[in-house]
């Protein structure tokens, strides 16, 4: 308590919350790290295709890092497996905001494992696109 009185925050509204700025910064760094892992260890794509549920063998550390990143993302905009017909037809759906119907992709998959791997590939594609868009915004500024 050696701080002098003028060092205290007297009006919290004068100090904007910078957590969103920092989240964007650190999330971009994580996206770059994820793409670096995928590019330097392309075998994790095959590993995921062979075992998309992860129950046969524990995933490699590189695949686990990619999974952890995908799982920490906000719910809105995430993909999930929509069962069109049990045991025979699966599609990918995207979660929208509350009260909005999910968007289904046109692709259909014969097994849940095929659909799960397609979601994995779609998430990787999204991360690449987000990084590309961020780079274009930086160039434009």
UniProtKB/Swiss-Prot annotation:
Heterotetramer of two DmfA1 (alpha) and two DmfA2 (beta) subunits. It comes from Paracoccus aminophilus. The keyword Hydrolase applies. Keywords: Hydrolase, Plasmid. The gene is dmfA1. The keyword Hydrolase applies. GO terms for molecular function: N,N-dimethylformamidase activity. It comes from the Bacteria. This is N,N-dimethylformamidase alpha subunit.
């Amino acid at each position: 308590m050696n701080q002098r009185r003028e060092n205290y925050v007297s009006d919290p509204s004068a100090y904007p919350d910078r957590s969103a700025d920092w989240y964007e910064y650190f999330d971009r760094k994580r996206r770059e790290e994820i793409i670096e892992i995928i590019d330097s260890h392309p075998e994790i794509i095959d590993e995921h295709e062979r075992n998309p549920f992860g129950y046969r063998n524990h995933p490699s550390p590189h695949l686990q890092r990619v999974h952890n990143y995908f799982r920490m993302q906000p719910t809105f905009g995430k993909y999930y497996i929509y069962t069109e017909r049990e045991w025979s037809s699966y599609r990918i759906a995207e979660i929208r905001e509350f009260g909005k119907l999910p968007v289904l992709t046109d692709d259909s998959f014969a097994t849940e494992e095929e659909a799960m791997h397609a979601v994995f590939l779609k998430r990787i594609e999204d991360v690449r696109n987000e990084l590309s868009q961020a780079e274009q915004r930086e160039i434009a500024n």
